[in-house]
Every structure is written in C-alpha cells, then in structure tokens.
C-alpha cells in the first residue's frame, strides 16, 4: 500500500475480478491477456475477454473446454482497489470465439459479453399497453421489469401518463423507444434500470486531477466547445382553429454545470433553433417531451475526452453521473457529466478512457477554489 502524503489517500494497484455463475474464474487468470469493457449512456454495455489457451496431454484446452466459458452464462466484472471492490458491468456471455492458427501455441479464445439488456432482447412481444385503461410509462416499466432479475432505480422519472401505446418489439427495444419518447436516458447498472432525465444534480464522483503533481491520475485530457449546436428545439402543432400550424420552441431545462452558459443567446445573432419533423402518430405531450430531451442533449456543447490511470484514481468512473475536473484552467474546469467510459485491464494496468459533457463554462467545483491551487 502506498500513501499519498499530499492527499492522505491510499493507492493500490487495481485488480480485475471476473465471476461467472457467481464463482470467480481465478483458475483462468493465468491465461487472461486483456479485459475491455465499453460503457455508454446510449448503447448496451459490452465487453471482451481475451485469453491465450493451451492443450494438455489429454487434448483438453484450458479455456474453451472450461464449462464456465459458455454463451448465456451470467458474468460480472469488478475492479478491486485494495479491500474496496466496485462493479464495472454485469450481464451474460454473448459469444465465444476460439482461434486455432497454424502455430498451436498461439491459440486464443475471445469471450464477448453484454450487459443485462441482452436477456431482455430474446422475445419479440406484441402487446397493446393501456388498451382498456390508459396507463403510464412508470407502470409499463414495472410490469416489464417483473420478468427479469432487475430492479427499477429509485431515482427513475415518472414518464408520460394517459398512454395507449403498442409494443411490437423486444422488451429492451421497446423501453429504449419509450425513453427516447420521454427525452430520457435508459441505463442498466449494478442490477438497476435507470429510466429518467440526465442526473446532473447527483453527487459528483471523485474529482479527475490533471497536472496535479504526484496526485495526477489523468494523463491525457482534451476539451472542445462546439458553438454550432442550437439553443432551442422547435416543432409545429396543429392549430385549434384555422389551418396554419403553431410553432413551439423548447428550451433546455437541465441545471447548469458551470457559472457561464455555453450557449449563443447573447451573441447578437439571430435565434439558433432547429425544428423537428412531427411523426403523425405522436401525441403533443410526447413530442414536447422528445423535443425537450433533444434540447437538453444539444445544450451539452462542451465535450472532453481523456484517460485515467484507474489504479491511481481508485474508483470505477460511472456513466450517467457528474464528475469534477480540476487542473485545466478556470474556464474549462468544473463539473462535467460522464457520457461514456472504456475500461481496459492489460499489462499496462487499469486504464479508463472517458468522454465527458458540459453545458457551461466556469469553475464550479465545491468550495470555488481549485484543489490544485499552489501546485505547479
């Protein structure tokens, strides 16, 4: 254990723990060469385990003949930081690929996995929700989740009500469509399904430190601000009288992640509004919710990318939650929103590559003063 005398934190090399059917596959670790996990707000989380494999005198291969390496086996990948263990992803083995090249000593096995959403993508369902009595998104979600070993996140949004909607898809595809209709995120993490707006006001994760001397754990970081994204999203609705459509403009309604808006409202130019085409089968309430979701997403004009030394950071950086960034100047540093994270365990250690989003400029870290003040 290494003690960081500046921060008082303990730093230990991160270890990867893999469990299949609830049992750690430690006997296969000597053959494991890389673990790669992709997590994002918009897609199913997926991962890849790469193994070398050896054949014994009885013709049995160490990895591909192991009963744990089978499609549809439940799998959990965790990161251990000393005595603290944090989950990265859980789901199922999706595919097993054994590669037998000319040299038998170079035989490899690749295991592909996907998060819990894959179990919700097996049965095509045709159902009329709210056919007898109009229903709500919250009720639909609870009904669907009752079929799976998943729980609704306590912070879920209410969604729309008064619904009569047809499902003609697998459960996960239908729920993703409902999330989009509400302007919501849909994230499966640690056995919970989150169905709600961006959680910009949640507690921030451990601050990412750039150029922080011996406390540095982010060794690559770049940030860009794209001004060519609209300040509002508009759509047309049918008038109560007459034939001319009525224009509605929807502004973002998410909290600011800084002290200065990153929009162009005060630029002195004409209003920056993008208009949506309205599908004929969408209600006015659903169109308004969708437009607001698009406006909120488009307000995230500041985008940062970088890479952490996971062992030094000491945590699994979680998607769909805020995180502070310090050491990049008073304009760009502050609270960001985690859009995606790629976790890699290899001979180089534990690396976390990330994409962060922000809708404002200015340092809004807790206390208003950089924790790196005085660090050159």
Language model segments and positions:
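Short acidic/polar beta-strand-loop edge motifs in secreted extracellular
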Residues: 62, 119-143, 152-177, 181, ...
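Assembly/oligomerization scaffold segments
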Residues: 1-113, 118
């Amino acid at each position: 254990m290494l003690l960081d005398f500046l921060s008082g934190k303990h730093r230990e090399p991160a270890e990867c723990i893999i469990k299949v059917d609830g049992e750690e596959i430690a006997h296969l670790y000597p053959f494991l060469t890389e673990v790669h996990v992709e997590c994002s707000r918009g897609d199913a989380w997926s991962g890849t385990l790469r193994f070398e494999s050896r054949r014994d005198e009885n013709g049995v291969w160490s990895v591909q003949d192991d009963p744990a390496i089978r499609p549809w086996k439940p799998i959990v990948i965790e990161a251990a930081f000393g005595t603290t263990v944090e989950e990265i992803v859980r789901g199922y083995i999706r595919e097993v690929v054994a590669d037998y090249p000319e040299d038998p000593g170079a035989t490899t096995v690749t295991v592909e996995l996907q998060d819990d959403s894959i179990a919700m993508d097996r049965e095509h369902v045709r159902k009329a929700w709210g056919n007898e009595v109009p229903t709500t998104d919250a009720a639909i979600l609870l009904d669907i989740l009752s079929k799976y070993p998943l729980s609704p996140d306590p912070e879920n949004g209410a969604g729309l009500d008064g619904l009569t909607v047809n499902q003609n898809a697998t459960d996960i595809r239908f729920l993703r469509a409902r999330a989009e209709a509400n302007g919501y995120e849909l994230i499966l993490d640690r056995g919970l399904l989150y169905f709600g707006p961006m959680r910009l006001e949640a507690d921030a994760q451990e601050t990412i430190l750039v150029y922080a001397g011996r406390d540095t754990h982010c060794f690559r970081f770049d940030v860009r601000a794209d001004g060519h994204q609209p300040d509002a999203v508009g759509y047309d609705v049918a008038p109560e009288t007459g034939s001319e459509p009525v224009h509605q403009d929807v502004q973002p309604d998410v909290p600011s992640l800084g002290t200065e808006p990153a929009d162009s409202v005060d630029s002195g130019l004409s209003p920056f509004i993008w208009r949506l085409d309205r599908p004929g089968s969408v209600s006015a309430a659903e169109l308004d919710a969708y437009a607001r979701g698009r406006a909120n997403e488009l307000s995230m004009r500041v985008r940062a990318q970088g890479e952490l030394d996971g062992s030094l950071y000491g945590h699994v950086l979680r998607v769909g939650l805020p995180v502070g960034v310090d050491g990049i100047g008073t304009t760009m540093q502050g609270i960001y929103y985690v859009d995606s994270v790629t976790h890699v365990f290899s001979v180089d250690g534990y690396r976390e590559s990330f994409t962060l989003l922000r809708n404002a400029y200015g340092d809004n870290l807790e206390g208003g003063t950089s924790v790196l003040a005085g660090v050159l």
